[in-house]
């Protein structure tokens, strides 16, 4: 992909939702646009701006001359805790309090002689206040939904669940009385779904629940944008993509997986844009280099999932008793309200076989030949990176559309198997052995490699996602620049 030759470069303002799983794909998009000659302004919240400085250093924030960082308040009380904030509070606050400071920022950028005129605003799909800001200034606005296409479609049907009387549930008994096994047969392009496969935010007894209302309303508001982009590829989610285009919007561009699309960017330049809010422990790569191909169980619950100390111990002894090498990511905040503490006898049992670190460069880990299976929460970043690496999955969804991604990984793409919510160590041992030692696991691995090859085809020169990215720049962005 060649860069754009122009005296005044196009200028994209990018606005991620303030969580690691949203900052990463927006940064990947910024990296891709920058490689095509765009000037980038990347807008974090003040809390995440501070975290990025701690993780990457002030020199990273100072950036390149044409890739700049700005920050706006999120409306929440100040905290210096190195963790993702409480998601419902954060979501409610961003939609209520971010519009005014964001408008002020856009006005400042427009008035500055040191930056090019703003060509477009590209905001996270759950930062839809940016649509109002863009309309205020007459700037094109593009929504980047960082979910899967099936997750996006599910959120668009929150209102239909209410209309049909399915949501809200009468009381909490629905969680264990079989109600969640009820078929959901009214979502176009998503056959064979059950309520348990829908995003977890539908599991409410009050439709005014913050996250149920937030995700449904943000999804519908995003349809007002000039275009929507998704970090997926057509062959992976063709049926639901066709349904979205037919029912809602034809201005949807599938431009992923980003992790493969960005391979055309020179490595030195690409490394300059890593956006982890935690410090990445690179010792894991050397550790993996010493392992046999397909021998390691990689475990990461993502940036938001929290577990109990009891669950931590079940995972620990399940991994230890499996007798397979493992790389386990244990964030400082992974245990609810406590520090993650494991007994000395666990460390003795896994000596020379297990590595525990707080955060890693996951894209590199999932591309490493030593990794044999990925135990994941099924967030979309992790899922699409896993597909891009050709790795099978052990799925343990936590919240949001992770349940939907798990359903597709296990039943549609056939690359995964699901763990029980109330996990016990014996089950984990059994599943790891199944995925690492049996024909079931080998078949899941073959399927994962097939999906990786299709992703590589989509993102190679002339592939569908590659061409869609070109079209996105020309149709959704640059045609407005000439007006």
Curated annotation (Swiss-Prot):
What is catalyzed by this enzyme?
A: 2-hydroxy-2-methylpropanenitrile + UDP-alpha-D-glucose = linamarin + UDP + H(+)
Q: Which Gene3D superfamilies match?
A: Glycogen Phosphorylase B
Question: Alphabetically, which GO biological process terms does the record hold?
Answer: defense response
Positions contributing to an anthocyanidin binding: 22, 400
Q: Which residues participate in UDP-alpha-D-glucose binding?
A: 146, 360, 362, 377, 380-382, 385, 401-402
Keyword annotations of the record = Glycosyltransferase, Plant defense, Transferase
Positions of disulphide bridges: none
Active site, renumbered: 22, 124
Superkingdom in the source lineage: Eukaryota
Enzyme Commission numbers on file: 2.4.1.63
- GO molecular function ontology, one term from the record: linamarin synthase activity
Q: In which tissues is it expressed?
A: Expressed in the cortex, xylem and phloem parenchyma, and in specific cells in the endodermis of the petiole of the first unfolded leaf.
- Per its database record, what is this protein's job? UDP-glucosyltransferase catalyzing in planta synthesis of cyanogenic glucosides. Able to glucosylate acetone cyanohydrin and 2-hydroxy-2-methylbutyronitrile, forming linamarin and lotaustralin. Also accepts, to some extent, a wide range of potential acceptor substrates, including simple alcohols, flavonoids, isoflavonoids and other hydroxynitriles such as p-hydroxymandelonitrile, mandelonitrile, (E)-4-hydroxy-2-methylbut-2-enenitrile and (E)- 2-(hydroxymethyl)but-2-enenitrile.
As for family, the record states: Belongs to the UDP-glycosyltransferase family.
Q: What is this protein called?
A: Linamarin synthase 2
Give the organism, scientific name: Manihot esculenta
- The encoding gene is UGT85K5
């Amino acid at each position: 992909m060649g860069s754009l030759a122009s005296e005044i470069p196009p200028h994209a303002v990018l606005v991620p939702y303030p969580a690691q799983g949203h900052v990463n794909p927006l940064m990947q998009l910024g990296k891709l646009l920058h490689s095509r000659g765009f000037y980038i302004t990347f807008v974090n919240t003040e809390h995440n701006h501070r975290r990025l400085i701690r993780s990457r250093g002030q020199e990273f924030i100072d950036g390149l001359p044409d890739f700049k960082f700005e920050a706006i308040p999120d409306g929440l009380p100040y905290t210096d805790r190195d963790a993702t904030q409480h998601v419902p509070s954060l979501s409610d606050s961003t939609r209520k309090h971010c519009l005014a400071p964001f408008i002020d920022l856009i006005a400042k950028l427009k008035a500055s002689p040191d930056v090019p005129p703003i060509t477009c605003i590209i905001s996270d799909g759950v930062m839809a206040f940016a649509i109002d800001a863009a309309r205020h200034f007459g700037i094109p606005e593009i929504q980047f939904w960082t979910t899967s296409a099936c997750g996006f479609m599910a959120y668009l049907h929150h209102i239909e669940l209410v209309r049909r009387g399915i949501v809200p549930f009468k009381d909490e008994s629905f969680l264990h009385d079989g109600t969640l096994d009820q078929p959901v047969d009214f979502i176009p392009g998503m056959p064979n779904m059950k309520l348990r496969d829908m995003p977890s935010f539908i599991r409410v007894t009050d439709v005014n629940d913050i996250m149920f209302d937030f995700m449904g309303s943000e999804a519908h508001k995003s349809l007002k944008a000039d275009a929507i982009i998704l970090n997926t590829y057509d062959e992976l989610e063709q049926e639901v993509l066709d349904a979205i285009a037919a029912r809602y919007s034809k201005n949807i561009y599938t431009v992923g997986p980003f992790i493969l699309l960005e391979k055309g960017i020179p490595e030195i330049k690409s490394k300059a844009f890593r956006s982890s809010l935690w410090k990445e422990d690179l010792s894991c790569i050397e550790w993996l280099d010493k392992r046999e191909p397909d021998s390691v169980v990689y475990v990461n619950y993502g940036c938001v999932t929290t577990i109990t100390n009891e669950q931590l111990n079940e995972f620990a002894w399940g991994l230890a008793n499996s007798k397979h090498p493992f790389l386990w990511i244990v964030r400082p905040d992974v245990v609810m309200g406590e520090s993650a503490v494991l007994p000395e006898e666990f460390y003795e049992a896994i000596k020379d076989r297990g590595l525990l670190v707080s955060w890693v460069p996951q894209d590199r880990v999932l591309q490493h030949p030593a990794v044999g299976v990925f135990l994941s929460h099924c967030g979309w970043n992790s899922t699409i990176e896993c597909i891009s690496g050709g790795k099978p999955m052990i799925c343990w969804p936590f919240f949001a559309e992770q349940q939907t991604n798990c359903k597709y990984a296990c039943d549609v793409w056939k690359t995964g198997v699901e763990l029980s919510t109330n996990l016990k160590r014996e089950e984990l041992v059994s599943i790891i052995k199944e995925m690492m030692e049996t024909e079931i696991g080998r078949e899941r691995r073959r399927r994962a490699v097939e999906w990786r090859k299709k992703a590589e085809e989509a993102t190679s020169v002339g592939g569908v996602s590659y061409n869609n990215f070109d079209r996105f720049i020309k149709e959704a962005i640059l045609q407005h620049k000439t007006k």
